[in-house]
Amino acid sequence: MKALLLLGLLLLSVTVQGKIFERCDLARTLKRLGLAGFKGVSLANWMCLAKWESNYNTKATNYNPGSRSTDYGIFQINSRYWCNDGKTPRAVNACHIPCSDLLKDDITQAVACAKRVVSDPNGIRAWVAWRAHCENQDVSQYVRNCGV
């Protein structure tokens, strides 16, 4: 019985963790999904953003008590403006998706929503982590030796 409980807890922890991309695997995936150069943002900048927002983790979430919103997924897309989590007050849902779609191992919907975010006037500057860690920095290390 204890062995089954331990196995169940182990499987639960693996499920909650989600997919943590290897750096070059993510770079290739983002390129394949059309983010390289989208709205003038280099692939290296997208990689830097994903590193600092989620550490390449598809299941990353971060609650923001001030706005009572949550950031979701590999790009930490916010429920106040971009997705619907059913609990954020006055949510806009500009990407027209449930926030749970941003937590999937298949990041196709997360990339589509990130494209929507970066298409707004703030562009890539909409992400605080990008402004803090990537803006005006040499971000080439995030794609180095990835063949992209």
From Swiss-Prot:
Enzyme class, top EC level, equals hydrolase
Active-site residues per Swiss-Prot or TrEMBL entry = E53, D71
What EC number(s) has UniProt assigned to this enzyme? 3.2.1.17
- The source's domain of life comes to Eukaryota
The main location is: secreted
The UniProt record lists the C-type lysozyme domain at 19-148
Q: Name one GO cellular component term.
A: extracellular region
Q: Which cysteine pairs are joined by S-S bonds?
A: C24-C146, C48-C134, C83-C99, C95-C113
What GO biological process term is on the record, naming one?
defense response to Gram-positive bacterium
Annotated localization:
Secreted
User: Which SMART domains does UniProt cross-reference here?
Assistant: LYZ1 (SM00263)
Asked if the Swiss-Prot or TrEMBL record annotates the protein with the keyword Hydrolase, the reply is: yes
Subunit structure, per the record? Monomer.
* Function description: Lysozymes have primarily a bacteriolytic function; those in tissues and body fluids are associated with the monocyte-macrophage system and enhance the activity of immunoagents.
| Note, other | Lysozyme C is capable of both hydrolysis and transglycosylation; it also shows a slight esterase activity. It acts rapidly on both peptide-substituted and unsubstituted peptidoglycan, and slowly on chitin oligosaccharides.
Protein name as it appears in the record: Lysozyme C
- Organism the protein comes from: Phoca vitulina
